[in-house]
């Protein structure tokens, strides 16, 4: 709009949890990071970064780990679970990129300083152990490029909720 008429825009992205969906090109940006580091190292790095930024007190420790250690997984399990986390990261990346485009458009139009932005999401990392889709007759539903991996699992969910316990479907800190 070129005038100062108020407007309302509701922009809804699919929440970054099951069913996880992202473009393969975006997934590729994150796969190696998660495959190489695994959840143990990622969790430690996120905790340190939050403490360094003052988001959490450096004295806050980690919640008890309730999952297998990354090094206990087979190579095939590491490949599979790293891919699932990369799909999640790609989905968040896409949302972040496009929200950035919207903000840039508001800046260019001179409307950003007179705009109220609410960013809302659901309540924490999703750990539901949904399985791969399969067995159906509708090929578009059973297409990995469309369905991605329905969930990234409990270990990545607990990593995402660092330093808190559990995940969103529990009445814990996650």
Which ranges hold each PLM region?
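Active-site-proximal cap/lid insertion segments
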Residues: 1-174
